[in-house]
């Protein structure tokens, strides 16, 4: 297969093993853990050009390129990562990973539990938080010999991780890019997550999370959970333009099977997702979203939480994103401005809703490229650091 000129091409994931115990916010300890990682580009001599990519709820380490010659689909953010793209791999060394609790190679519910005869953790896997993820990412940074990230970048739940980095490790990143995100979930967002979780928990095939041991899988519950989530990722206008009230067969069938194109789309998305994602992981990821609130330890003051940050910020929102509306990004911006922190903010007119952050929207790409800068900017920041 001939890959596009601006693709990173074939990539091979790497597994990093950490033998030291990981103490989690929930009070439990993972005796050891593994992280699945992909890297793109080349780390320069002084290790000043490294960018960390943090993934969203259903994301993973495969952010760009292809795993096989016959792959039809590239990594989840291939539109922005590659030679000459917004995150230019000719200039930057890009690191993407699958967080713990995930189901794409890092230690999670499907991994063997050393304290239970190496049976899958299943529901015994501890609940993890965004702070736990950032802690493991910092450990990965140490393993790679990267003391300071040039930038930490993320969209949605990934943006929350980037924001947590700026609070927990203010001396270890120069730039923070928070896209289509929020400083904490609203009651409405927590409600959406609870409906998704109940869809899984109430599936008879869930077996209290021990479905692998029972040779079953809560497919129906996971399909419903994804359908609910997908509705919130798209804007009303995007759904109107994509589907309208179009019928699959062109006429009413007067039944409960699929009739409207939007129904067909949601069922297809749910079906595809259920084949590739673990139900226990979905539960863990949504709880991590619910728990995220960096202001909680600062008297519930986001302004106070952001007071010790030292990096430059780019905050991006999208006009039709109603899952994490622009007003939520503006809360972050206001807290930074109050603290006299360097921040750039852009609310981009886009019709794709929350999923806009995954698309190569021209102004979005241009802004991201400009904020990250290029080789000349890397030289100047390296001189400043020395």
Swiss-Prot record:
It is an enzyme of class 2 (transferase). Its main location: cytoplasm. Transfers a succinyl group from succinyl-CoA to L-homoserine, forming succinyl-L-homoserine. GO terms for cellular component: cytoplasm. It catalyses: L-homoserine + succinyl-CoA = O-succinyl-L-homoserine + CoA. Keywords: Acyltransferase, Amino-acid biosynthesis, Cytoplasm, Methionine biosynthesis, Transferase. Belongs to the AB hydrolase superfamily. MetX family. The active site is at residues 156, 321, 354. It is found in: Cytoplasm. Homodimer. The record marks 323 as: Important for acyl-CoA specificity. It holds the Pfam family Abhydrolase_1. InterPro entries: AB_hydrolase_1, AB_hydrolase_fold, HAT_MetX-like. This is Homoserine O-succinyltransferase. Pathway: Amino-acid biosynthesis; L-methionine biosynthesis via de novo pathway; O-succinyl-L-homoserine from L-homoserine: step 1/1. Its EC number is 2.3.1.46. Residues 49-358 form the AB hydrolase-1 domain. Substrate binds at residues 226, 355. One of its GO terms (biological process) is methionine biosynthetic process.
């Amino acid at each position: 297969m001939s890959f596009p000129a601006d693709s990173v091409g074939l990539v091979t994931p790497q597994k990093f093993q950490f033998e030291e115990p990981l103490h989690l916010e929930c009070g439990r300890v993972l005796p050891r853990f593994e992280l699945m990682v992909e890297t793109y580009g080349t780390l320069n001599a002084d290790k000043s050009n490294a960018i960390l990519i943090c993934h969203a709820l259903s994301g993973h380490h495969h952010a760009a390129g292809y795993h096989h010659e016959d792959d039809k689909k590239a990594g989840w953010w291939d539109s922005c990562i590659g030679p000459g793209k917004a995150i230019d791999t000719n200039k930057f060394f890009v690191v993407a990973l699958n967080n713990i609790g995930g189901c794409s190679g890092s230690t999670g519910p499907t991994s063997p539990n050393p304290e239970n005869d190496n049976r899958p953790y299943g529901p015994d896997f501890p609940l993890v938080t965004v702070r736990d993820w950032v802690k493991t990412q910092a450990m990965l940074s140490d393993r790679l010999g990267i003391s300071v990230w040039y930038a930490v970048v993320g969209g949605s739940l990934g943006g929350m991780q980037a924001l947590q980095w700026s609070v927990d490790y203010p001396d270890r990143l120069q730039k923070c890019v928070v896209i289509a995100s929020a400083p904490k979930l609203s009651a409405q967002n927590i409600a959406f997550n609870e409906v998704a979780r109940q869809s899984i928990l109430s599936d008879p095939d869930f077996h209290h999370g021990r479905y692998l041991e029972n040779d079953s899988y809560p497919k129906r519950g996971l399909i419903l959970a994804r359908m609910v989530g997908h509705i919130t990722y798209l804007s009303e206008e995007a759904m109107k333009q994509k589907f309208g009230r179009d019928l699959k067969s062109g006429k009413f069938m007067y039944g409960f099977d699929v009739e409207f194109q939007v129904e067909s789309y949601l069922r297809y998305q749910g079906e595809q997702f259920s084949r590739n994602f673990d139900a226990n992981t979905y539960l863990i990821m949504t709880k991590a979203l619910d728990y995220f609130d960096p202001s909680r330890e600062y008297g519930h003051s986001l302004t106070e939480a952001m007071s010790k940050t030292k990096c430059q910020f780019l905050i991006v929102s999208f006009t039709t994103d109603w899952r994490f509306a622009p007003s939520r990004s503006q809360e972050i911006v206001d807290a930074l401005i109050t603290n006299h922190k360097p921040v750039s903010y852009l609310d981009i007119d886009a019709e794709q809703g929350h999923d806009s952050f995954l698309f190569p929207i021209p102004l979005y790409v241009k802004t991201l490229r400009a904020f990250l800068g290029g080789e000349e900017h890397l030289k100047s920041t390296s001189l400043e650091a020395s």
